């Protein structure tokens, strides 16, 4: 565990206890840290230490929540992960495991969504990877609400809670704070046929951020 957060550290034996390029990799919705070991092994083979934490209500933190309750808590999970990223980073730094300029954050699906929020929140992230994610938090949240209404589903919260959630999301919505990218390297991948997280929103993000990277070497 790192700061009481269940996590795996995947590394070569000779890196143990030493400063080394490190990536914190975040799993998707209803997944867990062990399900992303293939990403970790590939990154380790490329010379990168990987930290795999379990998100709130996932993996070792599963409290038996069904799909409906987990879906209703989606944004709480994302916001909790953003907060916990700072705790993980601080703990790794205090243990002398990080190298200046060599700290990355990445993830798939919900993990990629969290990565975008982390980029809007933390300057210590040097490089990021987002696969099948969505940086437009308010747009995604509104789409989820519209979906629930269309299906005739009643959310177990009142409107004031929803309003407060949107205020919290605005603070970490990368699409509203693109200047916070500060031209940091960001690898984005998204399949056009994705039916869970719309590809169109990633396409929109690419159009929004491309001008911000003009003049960079890559």
Model-based region annotation:
Residues 139-198:
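The feature captures the conserved acid-bearing segment of alpha/beta-hydrolase catalytic domains
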Residues 71-96:
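Alpha/beta-hydrolase active-site loop
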Residues 39, 198-209:
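Short alpha-helix in the alpha/beta-hydrolase fold that links the catalytic acid
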Residues 1-17:
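N-terminal cap/lid segment of alpha/beta-hydrolase-fold proteins
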Residues 42-66:
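Conserved alpha/beta-hydrolase
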Residues 88-147:
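Primarily recognizes the serine-hydrolase "nucleophile elbow" in alpha/beta-hydrolase
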Residues 18-28:
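Short beta-strand element of the alpha/beta-hydrolase
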Residues 29-41:
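The serine-hydrolase catalytic nucleophile loop
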């Amino acid at each position: 565990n790192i700061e009481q957060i269940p996590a795996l550290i995947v590394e070569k034996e000779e890196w143990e206890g030493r400063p080394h390029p490190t990536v914190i990799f975040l799993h998707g919705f209803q997944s867990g840290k062990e399900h992303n070991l293939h990403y970790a092994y590939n990154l380790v083979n490329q010379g990168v230490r990987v930290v795999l934490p379990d998100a709130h209500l996932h993996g070792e933190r599963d409290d038996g929540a069904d799909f409906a309750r987990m879906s209703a808590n989606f944004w709480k999970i994302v916001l909790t992960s953003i907060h916990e990223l700072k705790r993980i980073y601080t703990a790794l730094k205090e243990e002398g495991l990080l190298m200046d300029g060599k700290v990355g954050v990445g993830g798939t699906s919900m993990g990629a969504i969290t990565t975008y929020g982390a980029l809007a929140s933390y300057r210590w992230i040097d490089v990021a990877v987002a696969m099948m994610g969505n940086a437009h938090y308010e747009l995604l949240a509104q789409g989820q609400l519209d979906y629930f209404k269309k299906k005739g589903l009643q959310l177990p919260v009142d409107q004031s809670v929803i309003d407060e959630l949107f205020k919290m999301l605005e603070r970490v919505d990368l699409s509203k704070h693109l200047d916070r990218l500060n031209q940091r390297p960001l690898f984005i991948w998204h399949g056009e046929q994705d039916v869970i997280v719309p590809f169109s929103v990633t396409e929109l993000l690419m159009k929004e951020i491309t001008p911000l990277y003009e003049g960079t070497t890559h």
